[in-house]
């Protein structure tokens, strides 16, 4: 660097007093010696040694310390504040999911007097891109990273009667074919009884229904499945579960045969066979109620009250993206997704859902306020959090000690 500066200092005076043709030759020599770009070398030679005299001071120009160009931000603080409010209301989703639904969400929030912005701010909101949304919200995004454990006890007696799901047997483009799973709320301690959430996800529309049960007894899970089925906006045509005994049982098998529901199961120890519902286990259930231990009747009732609002919030207002294709390029996998749509919009687009059912959904949608639903969910989450007291954790510790003692001393 010092050698380059010495060459520039020696060449600059000769360059500044030379004619145009001579300057071109001097410039070529400097580029060859220093490996500067021609434009940068020209500017260094032209401005080297120049002096500025602001007031009584005399400053020598150093072109290497050029001030960055100042440009006013197009998306100002008003846009960022409105975007932040909508983003929080939409449960902190990414820009690619948020941007396609932004125009509709602005209309809905204005209709319910939840969003107030001037005409220019609204125009900017409607033209913002997904990448810009992520950039503007970058400082607010790094939160809520949680991990969980799966606890499924296999059921083996009826496996040979329930076929493993294949793509030939299922029509994943038709609403009504869904995956089911249980999410355990054991709080990291699997001893004793604790609440379970039954999660049913439709593959075609991503419509998701959840219901809490007191434990994973077959009778409770079967009763919850019947209730969940009634909430679906289309007929239930197929069920796919893991190999847990709460699903692989004679009662559910006879029920599916009687109701003409295709009942299949995933391959043992292949968790990705149920990838759709496993994704919702986190994005809907875990994000809403966390990883604490819930093992009382009061907590089970609170969970179901929360889920009654959560189903409206997620199915009508939270967009989802579905994978269209995967292509391996070298060591990387390039994935392509469809446009983000809410489950409600996917149901309306389906030609296999009746017009009467679509009209019912439109009527229901017109009455819903997403901001009010979000506030209600947050209040219920706070009530649920208060029930996880220190006494609860002491009871967990006691059950762990009892279980450990039984293992070490079986008599």
Residues covered by each model-derived region:
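Secondary-structure boundary/capping micro-motif
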Residues: 1-238, 243-411
């Amino acid at each position: 660097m010092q050698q380059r500066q010495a060459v520039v200092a020696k060449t600059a005076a000769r360059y500044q007093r030379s004619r145009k043709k001579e300057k071109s030759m001097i410039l070529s020599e400097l580029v060859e010696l220093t490996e500067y770009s021609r434009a940068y070398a020209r500017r260094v030679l032209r401005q080297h040694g120049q002096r500025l005299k602001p007031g009584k001071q005399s400053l020598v120009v150093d072109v290497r310390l050029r001030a960055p160009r100042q440009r006013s931000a197009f998306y100002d603080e008003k846009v960022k504040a409105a975007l932040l409010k909508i983003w929080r209301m939409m449960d902190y989703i990414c820009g690619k999911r948020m941007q396609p639904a932004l125009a509709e969400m602005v209309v809905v929030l204005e209709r319910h007097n939840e969003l107030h912005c001037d005409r220019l701010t609204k125009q900017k909101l409607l033209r913002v891109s997904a990448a810009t949304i992520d950039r503007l919200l970058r400082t607010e995004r790094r939160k809520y990273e949680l991990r969980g454990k799966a606890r499924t006890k296999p059921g083996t007696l009826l496996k040979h009667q329930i076929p493993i799901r294949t793509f030939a047997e299922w029509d994943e483009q038709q609403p009504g074919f869904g995956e089911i799973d249980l999410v355990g709320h054991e709080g990291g301690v699997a001893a004793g009884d604790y609440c379970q959430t039954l999660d049913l996800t439709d593959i075609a529309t991503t419509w998701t229904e959840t219901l809490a049960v007191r434990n994973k007894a077959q009778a409770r899970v079967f009763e919850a499945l019947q209730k969940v089925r009634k909430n679906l906006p289309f007929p239930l045509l197929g069920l796919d579960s893991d190999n847990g005994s709460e699903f692989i049982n004679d009662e559910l098998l006879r029920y599916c045969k009687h109701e003409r529901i295709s009942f299949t199961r995933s391959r043992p120890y292949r968790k990705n066979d149920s990838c759709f519902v496993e994704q919702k286990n986190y994005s809907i259930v875990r994000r809403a109620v966390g990883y604490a231990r819930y093992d009382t009747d009061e907590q089970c009732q609170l969970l179901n009250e929360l889920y009654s609002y959560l189903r409206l919030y997620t199915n009508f207002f939270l967009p989802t993206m579905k994978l269209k294709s995967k292509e391996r390029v070298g060591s990387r996998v390039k994935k392509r997704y469809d446009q983000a749509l809410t489950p409600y919009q996917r149901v309306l687009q389906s030609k296999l859902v009746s017009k009467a059912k679509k009209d019912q959904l439109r009527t229901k949608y017109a009455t819903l306020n997403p901001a009010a639903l979000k506030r209600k969910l947050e209040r219920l989450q706070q009530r649920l959090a208060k029930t996880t007291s220190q006494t609860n954790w002491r009871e967990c510790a006691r059950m762990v000690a009892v279980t450990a003692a039984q293992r070490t001393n079986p008599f």
